[in-house]
Every structure is written in C-alpha cells, then in structure tokens.
Amino acid sequence: MPPGVELSEVQGNVLHAYGADFPCARFVRLRLASQARAGEAATVVAGWLREVSFGRRPKGLPERDRLTPHLNLAFTAGGLTALGVPTTLLHEFPPEFRAGAKARAAALGDRWPDERPFTESHLLLSVHATGHAACERRVRELLEGNAAAGGPLEVVQERAAGDEGGGREPFGFADGGSQPAVEGVDLDPVGDGVYAARTAPAGRLRQRAEDLGIVQAKRDWRLVRTGEFLLGHAGEDGAAAPGPSAPLGPNGTFMVYRELDQDVHGFADYVAEQARRVGMPARELQEKIVGRRREDGSTLVRPAEDFPQPAPAQSARERNGRRRRSNDFLYTADPQGYRCPLGAHVRRTNPRDALPGGGERTMRHRIIRRGMRYAPPDEGLVFVCYAASIENGFEFIQRYWINDGAALGLGAAPDFMLQQAGEAGRPTGHMVIPGYRPVVLPPPDRPFVTVRGCEYLFVPSRRACAWLAGLHAAS
C-alpha cells in the first residue's frame, strides 16, 4: 500500500462502493436561506458532519451497522464560501471547481433545459440505505434538525434514486461493471488497472502465454495511482493534483453530480425502426450502440461463451471475479471495431489501449463512477463520479472523448448515445457499425439522453470534516 493512504479517512462510496448492500439513495441539494444566517447554517452542518460515513466495507461491519443508512456530504465552492472557509484556502482550489458546473456547461456541450431550472446549491447531502423507506426516514430526521434551528438551510431539490431490484440503468443494461483498480485499495489490476505491455514476456515465453490464453497476465497490468482519485497523493504523472492544503485537502476528492434524463421509449422506437431497416435484431443493434451485452454487461470484444451465466446464489467474491474477467480485454484485439464498433459508447468513455500511447495515457483520465437510476416513475440516471481533478477527469472525457471523436479517429463525431441537441434543436451525429456491409445509423430526432443539470462538489476527508465542523466555533 502506498505510504499515507488512510482508507478510513475517505468518505464512504468513494473508494469502496455501497453497491448492492445499499441499493437505494436520496440526494438532497441545499443552500443557505440568507448569508445573514450563515452561523445558524454552520451549526446545523457541523452536526451533520459528525455523522458522515467513511471508508468501511459493509461486509466488515456489525449486523446492526450494515442496516444503518449512510450519510455523506459534499460542498460546492459557494457552499465553502458561505460556511466561512478562509479566502486563502478557497484560492487553493482549482479554477474549474471555483467556477462551478454552470459556468463550465457551454464548454462541455451542455444545454440544460429551461423548464424546471437546475438551481445551484451550496451542499449535497446523500443518504444510502437498504430501501427507499429507510432513506426517506433518515433524510427527514436530518432535515428536522434544520427545521428546529429555524430553517437556515433551504432544500433546493430532493432526488430519490436506486433500485431495490438492483443494477440496471433505464435502457436495460447492467451498469457500473467497470471501475478503476486503485493502488492501495484493490489487489487485482487485471482488466481495470493500467495495461503496460512492455512488461510482458517476449519470444517463445510470450508465444506460450498466447497459446495458453493468458496474454493479459497479471504481470501485464498494474494498479492506477491513488492520486488520480485522492488529493495529496501522487498520480500517474508522479505529482499530486492541485488542491487545498491541510487540513482541508488531503484524502479529499472532487465529485461531479449530474442528472441525466433518459428517453427510454424514444431509444426503443429508434432501435426498432433502424433494426427493421438494416435487417438486424433490435437487441443486437442496441448492444452495438452501447458496446456491451445487455444481459450481463460483458464486452463485445470477447465471445459470449467466455462469460457463462452466473449461478443465482453467487457469492460477492464470485460476482467480483466475474466482473474482473468481463473487463479483461484490450481494444487492440478488435482494431477495426467489427465486434465492438469504434463509436460504441463504452469505447468513447474509456478507450483503454486504443489511444496512441496505450492504456497508460487513458489512465490519466479515469474516474470512479457511482451512478444510480432515478427512482420510479422518473426515467434517468443520477451520474456521480469522483476524481482528484475535475478538469483532467470528467471534463477531459466529456470534451475530448464524448463530444469529439478526433482522438479516436472518428473526426468530430460525438458519442452517438450521449449526443445533445445541436444548434438546430436536434442531434446531428451518425454512427457507423463496421462489417462486410457497414451500417450507418442516422441521427435520432431527439437526444436519447438529456442533461438536466450538474454540480461540482468537494468531498472532504474525516479530518477535513472535523475541521469544517469546528470552523464556526473557532471564528
């Protein structure tokens, strides 16, 4: 484990996902009612900060705690300012965080809808629990404390998310199966770490490895440096990402909260129409657009026979092993995209070894994703990601891989799945599915996914939470 990695310092759900143990969540965005009430608001927030959950695996907890809802807090730049964080410390935060998501939206190609405006907040309170009722009860308890103090904080929005049935985004695909393997956290880098082919055996030894089907052996991979995800640690370039000094910065991270409305019926209708036109089964066409199999999320690069269906009572260890195996692939095995199209969504968001410089270049722009589908009846996704640099992580992926295909040899073509409406009010990007007779998919009449709004937040460590809780009292 790298020196200085203190997993108990990191808020829950960052390095260790709540996952299936806590499949439901409630996200509450709040802001100060007025700056004149900043002191009262700070007192309420200080109480919440003392109840924040940190990096513990649910399976390692006593049974009572495994059933207890988990609270996490994150702050916008405006929220830290309102709570009285000194200006000198605020200026140590990177400019994209200080500017906020709304100011950066145009550069990312976002056009937030005018109806139901997405109002900026000061802090995000999130509760994860075993069911929606437990989330609701815990949120009400926390907000009652605010009401008892006279309501110095106003609720901007509440969003219920998650699915007690588990694991699928609204278009029907298994989600969240590929996450970075992080140094100091994970043990097995295969599939989710950095692929470094230069460390692979050469000559006859290499040929023997190929014959045995173990080309992507463990020695060919390494874990992603901790500093890509946590402040105060070395990243892939050997340096720590810019951030505030102690006690506020180290072991903290940045969070992007994004609400993505999904046009489930529109996507299904489009796929059905195009499938009839090109003579392809609708399910196969869906999978070509996404780049993974709908049933289990396994890659199209490898044959389905490599991923036998799991037993119903599979253990967590077995599920994790299967997930790792499903991510043990390289796009150099499918350079023309005959199996997984070059424009498939999964290639656009994580090109792996397909970029010049291979997997090591890609790992400079990885994020940890913790998305959850909206609770019914709404259809969409709460996209949550964590990285030590919003600009180098989320924004880079959005600008240079999703909105622009040049780095992947696709010209200016956007991600077909995520493209937003253009100046004319509709998407403009095509998608090519390679083959003996290539299939060209025309732009849909309206986006499959619409960005409802977004916020950039700072997720403080245990020590930083204690410091923030005592900030108002000290002043």
Each PLM stretch: what is its role?
Residues 1-475:
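Long, low-complexity, Ser/Thr/Gly/Pro-rich intrinsically disordered segments that act as flexible linkers
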